[in-house]
């Protein structure tokens, strides 16, 4: 089944997007910026792979962040993102989870993105454990990331700094969440045959 599921996801990704696609903005200044951001983040090479994983996992997130004053894109698997607020059109707030191992400890960094009246607020919570399977206790973020503040505010920003993508497959397993399903979720028995 694994190979057939991968073939299905890869084929859908190829049908959805190819390197021949053109992304442009009417305003020349913004168009140049968008083109530069996409090029700097290997978008044309990485996006098809991201789409394939998103079809396999039921969704994915592209998160925007700054690194040394350069706009970066992070391609995140659906299982590393938990929506906390949404409307009929999009997910507007959520929590990202990243795992790290250092000095024999397992760390989980939770990054909570929330929209408030003055802009986007991002809160960081770090948890440390002796075991990979245990959530552990909260520790100061500076223990692993000395340069990272507990709270970051992007004043004036009124849109999420991420975009959630899900396959156009109705979620008939979890009705209350805006999450997608793997494109083959309803045909797993057939694929196993």
Name what the model sees in each region.
Residues 53, 57-59, 64-193:
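Structured, contiguous alpha/beta core segments that scaffold functional sites
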Residues 1-76, 80-81:
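Extended, helix-rich architectural segments
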């Amino acid at each position: 089944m694994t190979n057939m599921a991968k073939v299905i996801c890869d084929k859908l990704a190829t049908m959805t997007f190819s390197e021949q696609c053109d992304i442009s903005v009417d305003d020349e200044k913004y168009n140049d910026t968008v083109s530069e951001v996409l090029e700097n983040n290997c978008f044309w090479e990485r996006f098809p792979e991201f789409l394939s994983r998103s079809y396999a996992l039921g969704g994915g997130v592209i998160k925007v962040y700054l690194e040394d004053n350069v706009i970066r894109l992070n391609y995140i698997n659906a299982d590393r993102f938990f929506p906390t607020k949404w409307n009929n059109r999009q997910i507007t707030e959520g929590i990202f989870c990243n795992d790290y191992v250092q000095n024999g400890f397992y760390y989980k960094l939770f990054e909570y993105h929330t929209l408030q009246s003055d802009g986007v607020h991002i809160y960081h919570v770090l948890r440390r454990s002796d075991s990979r399977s245990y959530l552990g206790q909260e520790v100061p973020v500076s223990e692993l990331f000395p340069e990272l503040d507990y709270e970051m505010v992007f004043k004036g920003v009124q849109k999420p700094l991420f975009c959630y993508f899900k396959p156009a497959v109705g979620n008939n397993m979890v009705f209350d969440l805006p999450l997608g399903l793997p494109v083959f979720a309803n045909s797993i028995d057939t694929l196993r045959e």
